[in-house]
C-alpha cells in the first residue's frame, strides 16, 4: 500500500476513534472518511481492532522523537513532557484516551503493542545513560518509565488534574533523586 494512502487510513481511524470511541469506530466509516474502499482496508487489516492497533503504533499522530539531550535527566524530562502533551493536548489526548481505554475492554486491540513499541524506542535513552555512567546496572528502565508515564496518566487522565509545565522536571527529580533525606 502506498504510504500516503496508509497515512490517510490511519488518520481517519484515529480521528474516528477520538470522535466516536471504539464502539463507534467502523471499517466502513474509515473507508468513507479516507476515500479508500473497505475491501482494501480489510485486505491489509482483518478487523477494526487490527486496524486501530496498527494506527496507534504506526501513525505520526501519536509518534514521538526519542530525545538526546546529553543527560539522563534531560532525556527523561523530555520524554515525560512528551507524554504530558500527548495526554493533555488534542488531537493526541482524545485519541490516546479513547483508544487505550478501549483496550482495557477489548483485549483484541492489544494495547500492549503500543506500549511495547514506545518502550522499545525509549530504551535508547537508558542505553546511552548506562554508557555515560549515569545509570547503575541494577536500574530497571521499564519501571522508571512506568513510574514517570504512569504519574502523567494518573494526574491528567484518571484524576482529571492539570499537569503543569514543571511537572516533568518535578517527576523526574523524584524518581532520580528520591524523596528520602538521609539523617
Where are the model-predicted features located?
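Short hydrophobic/aromatic patch on the recognition helix
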Residues: 34-45
Amino acid at each position: 500500500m502506498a504510504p500516503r494512502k496508509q497515512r490517510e487510513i490511519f488518520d481517519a481511524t484515529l480521528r474516528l476513534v477520538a470522535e466516536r470511541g471504539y464502539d463507534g469506530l467502523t471499517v466502513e466509516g474509515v473507508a468513507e472518511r479516507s476515500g479508500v474502499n473497505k475491501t482494501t482496508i480489510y485486505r491489509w487489516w482483518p478487523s477494526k481492532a487490527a486496524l486501530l492497533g496498527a494506527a496507534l503504533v504506526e501513525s505520526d499522530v501519536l509518534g514521538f522523537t526519542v530525545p538526546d539531550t546529553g543527560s539522563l535527566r534531560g532525556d527523561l524530562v523530555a520524554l515525560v513532557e512528551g507524554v504530558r502533551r500527548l495526554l493533555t493536548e488534542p488531537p493526541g489526548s482524545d485519541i490516546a484516551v479513547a483508544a487505550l481505554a478501549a483496550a482495557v475492554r477489548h483485549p483484541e486491540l492489544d494495547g500492549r503493542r503500543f506500549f511495547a513499541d514506545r518502550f522499545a524506542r525509549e530504551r535508547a535513552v537508558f542505553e546511552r545513560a548506562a554508557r555515560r555512567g549515569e545509570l547503575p546496572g541494577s536500574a530497571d528502565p521499564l519501571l522508571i518509565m512506568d513510574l514517570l508515564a504512569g504519574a502523567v496518566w494518573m494526574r491528567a487522565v484518571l484524576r482529571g488534574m492539570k499537569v503543569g509545565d514543571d511537572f516533568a522536571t518535578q517527576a523526574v527529580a523524584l524518581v532520580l533523586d528520591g524523596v528520602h533525606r538521609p539523617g
